[in-house]
A protein has these predicted regions:
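Substrate-binding pocket helix/loop in short-chain dehydrogenase/reductase
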Residues: 88-89, 93-101
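Active-site helix of classical SDR
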Residues: 112, 147
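Conserved glycine-rich cofactor-binding loop
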Residues: 10-11
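The beta1-alpha1 cofactor-binding region of Rossmann-like NAD(H)/NADP(H)-dependent oxidoreductases
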Residues: 52-62, 94
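Residue(s) in the substrate-gating loop at a strand-loop-helix junction
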Residues: 131
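Active-site loop immediately N-terminal to the catalytic Tyr-X3-Lys motif
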Residues: 90, 138-142
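C-terminal helical subdomain
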Residues: 164, 171-172, 187-227
Length: 229
């Protein structure tokens, strides 16, 4: 049975992707930092829960090793954990810069590094949740956008580094998605992209032939004219 590890899997986009993977017969590990939330989400899906903060190297390593010990391999890695703190570069405290870099980029790198040996064995997939903010200037979300631009660059390089092993990587770049993270936008629910839209991108990619890959998917909000969705 194929398996997937989803960071940030207790809610939002990560949960939607995990639910769709479970519906299609995958064994799933959810990794998230709040024990109560990740255990409740895992119980709802019949998945395995790992309490892990993606800002911690130890937790990143443990999330992958726990999945390996439980399921023996890994077919799909979903790096969905992330956060954004609004502010200009000169207005953000160092701790807020470090937090975004630590979770959005460093944590993603560490989890991926640990998972690559398993993905080589399965000729698996990596899905990195980037953002449309990583594809265009985003005043007020400068650091967040920079971390997501880095994720896009990382994804493109991963494809070239790992193609001989049959491993493929996708950067998913949505605009505002109907999650708690986008509440500050003031947009109505029916104006936003849904978490299931992102999950559908994963499903589509997993149906590709071995000779095809889609390194970057941008999901725009219909009717939007703003830079980040």
């Amino acid at each position: 049975m194929p398996s997937a590890l989803v960071t940030g899997g207790s809610s939002g986009i990560g949960f939607a992707i995990a639910r769709m993977r479970r519906d299609e017969g995958y064994e799933v590990t959810l990794a998230a930092r709040t024990r109560e939330k990740v255990e409740a989400a895992a119980a709802e899906l019949g998945a395995h829960a790992v309490t892990a903060n993606m800002g911690s190297e130890e937790d990143c390593v443990r999330a992958v090793s726990d999945h390996r010990e439980r399921y023996g391999g890994l077919d799909v890695l979903v790096n969905s954990a992330g956060l954004g703190i609004a502010g200009t570069v000169d207005g953000l405290q160092t701790k807020h810069i470090d937090l975004q870099l630590g979770v959005n980029l460093r944590g993603l790198l560490l989890v991926t590094r640990e998972a690559i040996p398993l993905l080589r064995e399965s000729k698996g997939w990596v899905f990195n949740l980037a953002s449309i903010a990583g594809t265009a200037p985003t005043p007020g979300l400068t650091v967040y956008g920079a971390t997501k631009a880095a994720v896009i660059a990382l994804t493109r390089s991963q494809n070239l580094e790992l193609e001989a092993a049959g491993v493929r990587a996708v950067a998913i770049c949505p605009g505002f998605v109907d999650t708690a993270m986008a509440e500050w936008s003031g947009l109505a629910t029916d104006e936003m992209i849904t978490p299931d839209d992102c999950a559908e991108v994963v499903r589509m990619c997993l149906r590709l032939s071995p000779n095809a890959r889609i390194p970057l998917v941008v999901i725009e909000r219909v009717g939007s004219r703003d830079l980040v969705g």
